[in-house]
């Protein structure tokens, strides 16, 4: 939940660019409570319901390439706290040491099964665990690695007022992000200077328009975007 007072925020978030977003969210505590309850209940239910799917995907991943079933990486969530995000592994073993921390289209590190999982966004399913643990929400700014968060402007830091999310309007808008990075000579640099600002503009707009019902709409829009 959101802290009660602006001055209770971590020092790095106590800047004037963040204050307007805090005030907006502070007036919508009922929606924030509904969001929190919905996240935990829905995540628990889906983990139980989808357990057979988890098993099938785990077998497919292990048979396709060497490595663990799950990929775990340090990301940043509410108030700048770091956590380990869970995903189904979609890349070759030790992929992070072989290239950028974001992927581009036709990235050679992505496995055959991994490509299928990514196209259907099934690699994100283990994040239900993160939601249940309170690290993430169904809807919110996608969690970035610390390196990218260090490039945030003061206003961008407002996205850290809420837990990171599995999906968002920005995620839907930039669902083909890897194509934008395909021809980049320096993928990390292009992501930070060109892609990230656009995504954060959408994320900040989402905070201004936040409501529990808007979250539900975003979840429905995400499902429709995946099916298209």
Tell what function each PLM region has.
Residues 7, 11-14, 71-109, 170-196:
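Short, glycine-rich, amphipathic interfacial segments at transmembrane boundaries or analogous
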Residues 41, 107-112, 197-203:
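Bateman (tandem CBS) regulatory domains
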Residues 55-59, 74, 148-149, 153-161, ...:
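Intrinsically disordered, low-complexity boundary segments flanking structured domains
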Residues 57, 100, 139-141, 147, ...:
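Short, hydrophobic secondary-structure boundary micro-motifs
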